[in-house]
């Protein structure tokens, strides 16, 4: 059985991905950002949570990233700070999580033996559409600190 690590599993899309991967037969390590309430976000509501190993931690910690990537076959990296308005108030937090956190996951995957990483992005990297439908050739136009950090993480 393949083991998948899902970062950002506590978010809406991450929790839906966890459910899908469980149905497809994956053993899941689901990363939820640590909080003092021990709340797992959207993972709390999934029907298959008893089949999921929930880990609480922070992708900003490179040592923790090395720890959670041990014995993993694939990583689905969805973890990110996403609140656009707050990115103007605390842009360094977005740099630390969205850029450095992504780098930590990628470096840990490489050090563990080149684990495949599937990284998610956002339509925010394209800014205001110059044409529709937007495709991957559309120019990137960051319009917030959030979208700028997602563009950097995509690179």
Features from the language model and the residues they span:
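N-terminal Rossmann-like NAD(P)+-binding domain of SDR-like oxidoreductases, especially those catalyzing
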Residues: 1-155
């Amino acid at each position: 059985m393949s083991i998948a690590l899902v970062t950002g599993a506590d978010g809406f899309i991450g929790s839906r991905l966890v459910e899908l991967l469980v149905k497809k037969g994956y053993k899941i390590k689901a990363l939820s950002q640590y909080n003092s309430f021990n709340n797992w976000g959207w993972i709390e509501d999934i029907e298959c949570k008893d089949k999921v190993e929930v880990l609480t931690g922070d992708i900003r910690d490179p040592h923790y990233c090395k720890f959670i990537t041990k014995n993993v076959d694939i990583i689905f990296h969805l973890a990110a700070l996403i609140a656009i308005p707050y990115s103007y108030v605390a842009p360094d937090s977005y740099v630390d999580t969205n850029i450095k956190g992504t780098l930590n996951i990628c470096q840990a995957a490489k050090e563990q033996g080149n684990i495949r990483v599937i990284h998610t992005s956002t339509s925010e990297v394209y800014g205001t559409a110059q044409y529709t439908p937007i495709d991957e050739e559309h120019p990137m136009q960051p319009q917030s600190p959030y979208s700028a950090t997602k563009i950097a993480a995509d690179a």
